[in-house]
Curated annotation (Swiss-Prot):
InterPro entries: Meg (IPR056205). Keywords: Developmental protein, Disulfide bond, Signal. Transmembrane segments: none annotated. Expressed exclusively in endosperm. It comes from Zea mays. Belongs to the MEG family. This is Protein MATERNALLY EXPRESSED GENE 2. The gene is MEG2. It comes from the Eukaryota.
Amino acid sequence: MEYRKRVDALVFFSLLLLGYFAAHAHGKGHVTDDVGVSTPAKEGIMQGNGARCVVGFPPCKDNKCYCCIGGRTHARYSTMAECRHACF
């Protein structure tokens, strides 16, 4: 019985550490400097072919139905033109 408790504790702490490092690695995708502004290198990467504006799911909040995915911002916009201007 004592051996079983040790194995359970080892598995628990292993999963806990794995979760911590997974969350930490996921956070590395968002690079900011000391004042919270994205670095130019990261913005340049994000502006690549993956950036696009899409129509969000209804209901739209404050008549802002367009959102930028993979670009410089994650905000919502009223028109596709506004979204493209801010996103790219």
